[in-house]
């Protein structure tokens, strides 16, 4: 099992794609270079283009004699600077980085001031209009619990179960930065970014906090807010 951090700016997400560079591909090539083995790396979360990870977990099968504690040093020597393996450890054969996870936690950063910040342009969503953070906090409360989150998913695989349990959803402001964190037993495609976009609409007064339960009940994507851009999103924790 590997614990990985990466800056997603220059990658077309986690999952392997034929004609685009991805984090999975870069890591698999590094593992092959170090161990001489072609592996299939399974990630806990298939992050999208531009999304970052402070705690991604991945597993693969290997016969390498390199001790797990030495593996991060070997891999980091051949990986690009924007992908780092911070830990490696041996796990049971039944372990699956994605399906063994009990919960995942994401963080989203919003820069809420008149002008953008050049050094943060790839790491947050710049919203130039003042946001009512207290209203956003009230709205966040209604997302907690077990619901059908069909109104908060992008069109895609309709066979995926839309019922998810959100254990925690917080909104905090520190200076010009608004930090939104959400933890759940699983997420639908773009669910976190649509929840963030909806909270921003609440902050702008376009949606009232008290309307959130009705939006959830509607199961209608058009009733929710916009999809927040990817660069403000970070995978921060996986619980097994």
Curated annotation (Swiss-Prot):
EC number annotated for this UniProt entry: 5.4.99.12
Coiled coil: none
Organism domain of life: Bacteria
Gene3D superfamilies: Pseudouridine synthase I, catalytic domain, C-terminal subdomain, Pseudouridine synthase I, catalytic domain, N-terminal subdomain
Residues annotated as binding substrate: 106
An example Gene Ontology molecular-function term: RNA binding
Subunit structure: Homodimer.
Protein name, entry field: tRNA pseudouridine synthase A
Organism of derivation: Caldanaerobacter subterraneus subsp. tengcongensis (strain DSM 15242 / JCM 11007 / NBRC 100824 / MB4)
């Amino acid at each position: 099992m590997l614990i990985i951090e990466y800056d997603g700016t220059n990658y077309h997400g986690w999952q392997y794609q034929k004609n685009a560079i991805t984090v999975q591909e870069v890591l698999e090539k590094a593992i092959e270079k170090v161990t001489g083995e072609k592996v299939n790396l399974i990630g806990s979360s298939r992050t999208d283009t531009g999304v970052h990870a402070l705690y991604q977990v991945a597993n693969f099968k290997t016969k390498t004699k390199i001790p797990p504690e030495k593996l991060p040093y070997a891999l980091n020597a051949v990986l690009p600077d924007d992908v780092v393996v911070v830990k490696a450890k041996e796990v049971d054969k039944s372990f699956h980085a994605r399906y063994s996870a009990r919960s995942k936690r994401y963080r989203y950063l919003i820069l809420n001031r008149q002008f953008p910040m050049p050094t943060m342009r790839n790491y947050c969503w710049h919203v130039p209009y003042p946001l009512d953070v207290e209203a956003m906090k009230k709205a966040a409360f209604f997302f907690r619990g077990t619901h059908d989150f069909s109104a908060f998913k992008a069109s895609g695989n309709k066979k995926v179960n839309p019922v998810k349990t959100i254990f925690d959803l917080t909104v905090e402001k520190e200076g010009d930065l608004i930090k939104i964190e959400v933890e759940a037993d699983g997420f639908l495609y773009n669910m976190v970014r649509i929840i963030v976009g909806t909270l921003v609409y609440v902050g702008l007064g376009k949606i009232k906090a008290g309307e959130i339960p009705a939006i959830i009940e509607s199961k209608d994507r058009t009733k929710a807010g916009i999809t927040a851009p990817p660069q403000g999103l970070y995978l921060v924790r996986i619980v097994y």
